[in-house]
């Protein structure tokens, strides 16, 4: 069985090539850090004088134990949050996906590429949406299965989102 944590870390620090680096160091001079904030995990890597941090939530199928969704986000300037959703194969990529923060419409997503682990959909939240994420309950993701063509829904819990985001902001100052 594949080690999805290792795949996730490799994905974090290679697939997100636009990941901003900040002149900061991790507590105790550590080169890596991983902390959990309810349903979110903060992962950081420090090299020389730069530290890169992301927050991640992975969801697995209760029946098979296989990963079905990974949300990976990072803070950017201006109170914005950028990232990517890694979703399973078998989706109608041309139709993309739509997001709602609880019941409020969020950004529509376009799939950018597929990797051996699944298909990527970049996501960006503006400062107003980030405030809604911090006070919200779920990100509701809706997309369409390819065959048979039917809606597929995912819920990304926002428990711990605010604390995880605050932590990566503090670690990358």
Curated annotation (Swiss-Prot):
Organism (species): Brucella abortus (strain 2308)
Family: Belongs to the IalB family.
Keyword vocabulary terms for this entry: Signal
Signal peptide per UniProt: 1-23
Protein name, per record: Invasion protein B homolog BAB1_0368
Gene3D superfamilies: Invasion associated locus B (IalB) protein (2.60.40.1880)
Keyword Metal-binding: no
């Amino acid at each position: 069985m594949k080690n999805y944590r290792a795949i996730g870390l490799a994905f974090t620090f290679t697939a997100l090539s636009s990941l901003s680096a900040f002149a900061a160091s991790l507590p105790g001079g550590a080169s890596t850090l991983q902390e959990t904030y309810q349903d979110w995990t903060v992962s950081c890597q420090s090299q020389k004088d730069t530290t890169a941090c992301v927050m991640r939530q992975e969801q697995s199928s209760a029946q098979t134990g296989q990963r079905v969704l990974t949300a990976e986000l990072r803070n950017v300037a201006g109170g914005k949050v950028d990232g990517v959703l890694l979703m399973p194969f078998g989706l109608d990529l041309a139709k993309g996906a739509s997001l709602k923060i609880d019941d409020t419409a969020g950004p529509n997503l376009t799939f950018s590429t597929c990797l051996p682990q699944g298909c990527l959909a970049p996501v960006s939240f503006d400062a107003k949406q980030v405030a809604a994420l911090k006070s919200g309950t779920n990100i509701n993701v809706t997309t369409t299965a390819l065959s048979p063509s039917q809606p597929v829904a995912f819920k990304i819990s926002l428990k711990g989102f605010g604390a995880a985001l605050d932590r990566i902001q503090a670690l990358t100052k």
